[in-house]
Amino acid sequence: TGLWALPVLGLAQTFALGTGLNIAVGLVILARNAPPAQKKLVPLVLPGVVLWIVLAQSLFHKEWASLTTAGAYRMRGQAAESFAEYRAINQQPTLLYHRDGASATVTVKEFPKNHLFLQVNGKTDASTGTDMLTQLMLGHVPALLHAEPHSALVVGLGSGVTCGALLTHTGITNVDVVEISPEVVEAARY
């Protein structure tokens, strides 16, 4: 069900549905073994599960996506000189894109001053920050080390910067990209 539910409903709604179904099954099992007077409560199981799913929508608000994808990261070169500056540097990023897929939860977030980063399951895989050099070098170094490169294969699209770096080399006429998550392809547009 996760392969269907996660892309269609999202993580929060899949969680709500799964817990609701578990509660329903548990109550039905308990009701089967309950005294006859308590068996009258069995018809309330379905409305109770529906109520839980509706209430869960208010529990899993927009910040849910930011919290479940918050990864450990550090902002190199941004030492704060005051507490106010520390708070400004470490403020919450703006969530630009969020999608739960069958294989990953993908987000694109933005810190102030146009610092974008793409995360897969909370881990930053691409950004416009200091790791841009790494993304570029992953494309340039292999192309420069090969005597006559004509094509290349990139495993994992990320932001597409590595592919772009490869395509700047005149001998390379074809770059194939293998990406397991369609959500990463969508997010790369940012």
Residues covered by each model-derived region:
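Alpha-helical transmembrane segments of multi-pass membrane proteins
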Residues: 1-190
